[in-house]
Swiss-Prot record:
Protein name: Heat-inducible transcription repressor HrcA
Keywords: Repressor, Stress response, Transcription, Transcription regulation
General function of this protein: Negative regulator of class I heat shock genes (grpE-dnaK-dnaJ and groELS operons). Prevents heat-shock induction of these operons.
Pfam families: HrcA, HrcA_DNA-bdg
Family: Belongs to the HrcA family.
Organism this protein belongs to: Streptococcus sanguinis (strain SK36)
Length: 344
């Protein structure tokens, strides 16, 4: 059982240690804790016995253990604070015109990496929740074509493919018509299901020769099922982790799954301290925070860093970036949904 004073001591030690990265002795706490040095030492010993503090090899002071950081996150971390001193820098970073969503998310990730010194990932709305709102096929040459998907009326994905040898121009038109008839307005998750269940049953109604049609569907639709992962500060991993963690971030889909898995459906923020099922991330911290993408749903900003982070400062920085990012996205999508030629 951690007493109120012991909790205060633990919080203060974490605050000092995350700023100095030096073990903390009882004398360093006396100005802030209204107790004698002996009492503080006894409380520090009690915290050590509970596994929340640990001895340092080079000093008589103590430092927070992994369990100590986990306790702090669970009992003392405030998720509502804003890093107001960095608000101007964040607003200034977004104070120019962006031409697509990916650039806005990249700016947010780059900015948070700069502020935190950590690796940052930004995710769009989960692919399975997005809806197909437009589809077209553009013939590039005699043998190649480009499938153009628009999701949520704003997110464009393209997939280049070789036109099957047995296809005529009319077959491409039939393919386009089939997609528009069966898939427009459907979620990506529903489309994924229909390609495997409904389409094999009906393609003979549309195509004289059905060879390669299912394979072509799976090929051109493959990219819309994938997460769009925006990454910044990957090299930072090498400062607080090893090569296996660095290489883990070479697989964007695994990275996205790890981040999605850290947040429950109804959870807006999550801090996981040394709590990943991925062995290469087991000694790291993952902080995830959802942000609103107007008209579409929620994206996610995630920070990966060492256990000995200044959690309060970093969460406050993420809150500021999230708020300004949402403001920028609101303006961006309001423009997309307006009449381009209307007089302002």
């Amino acid at each position: 059982m951690v007493t109120e004073r012991q909790n205060e001591i633990l919080n203060l030690i974490i605050d000092i240690f995350t700023k100095t990265h030096e073990p903390v002795g009882s004398k360093a706490l006396q100005d802030s804790i209204n107790s004698s040095s002996a009492t503080i030492r006894n409380d520090m010993a009690a915290l050590e016995k509970q596994g929340l503090l640990e001895k340092a090899h080079t000093s008589s002071g103590r430092k927070p253990s992994v369990a100590g950081f986990q306790y702090f996150v669970k009992h003392s971390l405030s998720f509502d604070r804003l890093a107001e001193n960095e608000l101007y820098e964040v607003i200034k970073a977004f104070d120019h015109e962006f031409f697509n969503l990916e650039d806005i998310l990249q700016q947010a990730a780059d900015l948070l990496t700069k502020l935190s010194g950590c690796t940052v990932v930004a995710l769009d709305v989960e692919p399975s929740r997005q809806r197909l709102t437009a589809f077209d096929i553009v013939v590039l040459s005699q043998h190649t074509a480009l499938a153009v998907f628009t999701l949520d009326e704003s997110n464009t994905i393209t997939s280049q493919f070789m036109i099957p040898r047995n296809f005529l121009k009319e077959d491409l038109d039939r393919l386009k018509g089939l997609v528009r008839e069966r898939f427009l307005g459907q979620t990506v998750l529903d489309i994924h299901y229909k390609i495997r269940t409904e389409i094999p049953q009906i393609i003979q109604r549309y195509f004289t020769t059905t060879d390669n049609v299912i394979q072509l569907f799976e090929h051109i639709f493959g990219d819309i099922f994938k997460e769009n992962v925006i990454l910044s500060g990957k090299v930072q991993l090498l400062e607080f982790s090893d090569l296996t963690a660095y290489q883990f971030f070479d697989d964007p889909q695994k990275v996205a799954f790890e981040i999605r898995d850290s947040l429950a459906e109804d959870q807006m923020q999550s801090v996981r301290v040394a709590d990943s099922r991925e062995s290469c991330l087991a000694d790291l911290t993952l902080i995830s925070s959802k942000f609103l993408i107007p008209y579409r749903g929620f994206g996610v900003l995630a920070v990966v860093g060492p256990v000995n982070l200044d959690y309060q400062r970093l969460v406050s920085q993420m809150n500021v970036v999230n708020r300004v990012l949402t403001m920028k996205l609101t303006d961006f999508y309001r423009y997309l949904s307006s009449n381009h030629y209307e007089v302002h």
